[in-house]
């Protein structure tokens, strides 16, 4: 995606910390003074916003904001809005986490410890069609073959199937999922069957385990 024309840039900052949202806003406005910036503090607010209006140039996403667990928010956004770039912003700067975000389709990763000036350059690079990760991170070190295979299979899920899978991971029953998605239990069962087939597993439990392997060892500490 080419960089948006001056004055037409539209971004979403999705983070539950107002002070950090302010820092990101400053970083963006320092380069694009006329940018339109929407701010949300929960993942539910983000999805509601995008259901109303998906005409944005970039999403700046906090991995661990309320309503998102681990990589679930990123996985959902990449499935639902394939052409909308997502840059992850996080206090978890483990190299494995950064690489996994890129594996899952992020356009960049901005550590929360970066200066506003550095954030400004990172955002500008992504808007110019580049990817961004901290200079000391090598993307050459890949996940193991099994995890790579799971990530590839996750990419085949439809947006609704991703939502169902995330709810399964939270321990919800078909009845609860049906209520939340405003669909019938039969529809949920059909989604679950499709998920099992696409992930090459035989049970709901195995599907949840498959997702957990993507996150294994990466979230041992609670970090914003």
Residue ranges with predicted function:
Residues 98-103, 108-159, 163, 213-217:
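Short, flexible helix-to-coil linker/hinge segments that flank and couple to helix-turn-helix
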Residues 71-83:
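Short amphipathic alpha-helix used as the core "switch/output" element in two-component signaling
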Residues 196-224:
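Basic, Lys/Arg-enriched C-terminal extension of HTH/homeodomain DNA-binding domains
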Residues 62-63, 90:
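Active-site residues of response regulator receiver
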Residues 171-206:
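Recognition helix of helix-turn-helix DNA-binding domains
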Residues 54-60:
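Active-site beta3 strand of CheY-like receiver
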Residues 42, 69-72:
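Acidic catalytic/metal-coordinating carboxylates
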Residues 66:
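The feature encodes the CheY-like receiver
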């Amino acid at each position: 995606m080419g960089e948006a024309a001056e004055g037409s840039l539209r971004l979403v900052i999705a983070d539950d910390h107002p002070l950090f949202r302010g820092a990101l806003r400053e970083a963006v406005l320092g380069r694009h003074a006329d940018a339109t910036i929407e701010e949300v503090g929960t993942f539910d607010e983000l999805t509601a916003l995008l259901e109303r209006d998906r005409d944005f140039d970039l999403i700046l996403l906090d991995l661990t904001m309320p309503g998102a667990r681990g990589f679930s928010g990123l996985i959902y956004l990449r499935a639902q809005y394939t052409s909308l770039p997502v840059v992850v912003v996080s206090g978890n700067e483990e190299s494995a986490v950064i690489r996994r975000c890129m594996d899952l389709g992020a356009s960049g990763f901005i550590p929360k410890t970066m200066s506003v000036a550095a954030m400004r350059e990172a955002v500008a690079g992504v808007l110019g069609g580049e990817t961004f990760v901290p200079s000391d991170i090598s993307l050459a070190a890949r996940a193991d073959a099994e995890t790579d295979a799971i990530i590839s299979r996750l990419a085949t899920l439809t947006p609704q199937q991703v939502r169902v899978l995330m709810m399964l991971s939270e321990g919800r029953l078909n009845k609860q999922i049906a209520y939340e998605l405003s669909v019938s239990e039969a529809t949920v069962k059909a989604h679950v069957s499709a998920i099992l087939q696409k992930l090459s597993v035989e049970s709901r439990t195995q599907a949840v385990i498959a997702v957990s392997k993507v996150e294994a060892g990466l979230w041992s500490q609670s970090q914003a």
